[in-house]
Amino acid sequence: MKKFLIGIVILFPILAFAQKEDYIWLMGRENQTFDTTHGGGILDFNFTPPKASYHYREHDMFLTNSSMCDSSGNLLFYTNGCVIAGADDKVLENGEGINPGNAHNLWCVTYNDGYSGGVGNSLILPVPDSSNLYYLFHKRFVLYSNPQDAIFDKLYYTIVRIGTKQTLEPSKVLEKNGILMSDTLALGELVAVKHANGKDWWLITPRRNSNQFYIFKFTSQGIVDTFQQTIGILPDPQGEGLGQMVFSPDGSKLYRTYRYRPVMVYSFDRALGMFTQFDTIHFDYGNQLVGEIMCAVSPSNRFLYLSCRKLLFQFDLLASDISASQTTVAEWDGFADPFPTMFWQCQLGPDCKIYIVAGGDTRYYHVIHNPDVAGVACNVEQRGVKFQTPTGASMPSFPNYRLGPIDNPGVPCTATVSVNQPMIPIKDKPIWVYPNPANNSITIEYQAINGQNNQFLLFNTLGQTVRSVTLPQGQTSLQLPLGDLSEGVYWYSIPGLQNASGKLVISR
């Protein structure tokens, strides 16, 4: 029997080249010279673990929060919904006056706050086949004397050019507040997913309190097609702004949460740009006042997490009865500083961990360290990230920039294996699969457990069996070729045996 020891840090490669557009997260309030505890923050994923640091900034970050890095993880520009600023925090040429109107005048000018709205109110997409052009998509809020009459009435696009040494051109906003759609739109809920070709994008947002969606095709020519589709149930108007809408990392499912509604699940065809099926996941909110319901999906697409104020739930999306798989993986521990650090907005990080805003304007993010592990072993660390200043209840929303074409989707993030930690010897478990990540083949080492031939099964993230081989008695290892399988995350198991299942990453 072999015992393997990892003595170095291994970074799982996700593609043949770096894609680090989401490696810098910005949050926090504008600085006040008389109080350094009230200022900006940065979470930098170029460090392992990610580095949380103080950052002097004149721009307040709130619910409208988007940033963009280059492929090496260097910050290029960001927006708080009021202005567009560069990495030096200076407003880009023509970068002022984003989202014009009475909400801008009140929040951005009078109060010097960041732009409000719902979770996922803006996002940035790189222009396909361009090295320095980007589109910022963002929604405008219109205020009325009766706050309940306030609406999002426009979806805008703004084009940003980043200067390069080759062209000697300065970074500049080439066009701003171009009207992409005028309608009564949902609060936040602006998402994007790669086209099946792995290059173009689909941009999606619903109408307000509606099951009607606008779907836009974004290519190197800009927005080239617009579709409408009605599918599923109507959200409850009382839950407006208290949920989150996210794609699974592989882009096959869209999850939408609303108060007083089950989780709404939409199957999405990345080639056609349309929803093909609607389902729901019913769940128990627990013994607490029904409030916000935010969500995230694990890197392998296997587990859904619902962030519900005092409770954090996990669901197994491969279970025969998903609702019955509901598991409480964390409960708020009662900490407040000064506000209760409950569970709120979620975002999958580029390090394969899920980060959760801890309540409102506190100094913390919660962390799910192992989101692809079932049950409490997913390892939720409350207040796992502490900032020097309050976050302003702010967290950016990112699409999966690393998603590839439909036949080679890749993996959405880069996990880090800890150093100086011995792997479990074969004698302590019935099966060992290596190398992991794998390239074109794996070795399966196993022990005779039940005196009979066992079956080794390998599944893709859709739950489809892609390998089924017999592990004959009388030998202890078997070589399994994988050259025909696409890069990505897979799951293996030996039915009927305990501790005989796990995750396999194929990366070339």
Regions found by a protein language model. Name each.
Residues 417-427:
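Intrinsically disordered, low-complexity linkers and terminal tails enriched in Pro/Gly
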Residues 6, 425-434, 438-508:
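C-terminal outer-membrane/trafficking sorting elements
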Residues 14-18:
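Sec/Tat signal peptide C-region and signal peptidase I cleavage site
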Residues 4-13:
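Sec-dependent N-terminal signal peptides
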Residues 19-280, 288-418:
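Beta-propeller fold recognition
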Residues 203, 245, 254, 263, ...:
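Hydrophobic beta-strand residues in large extracellular and virion-surface proteins
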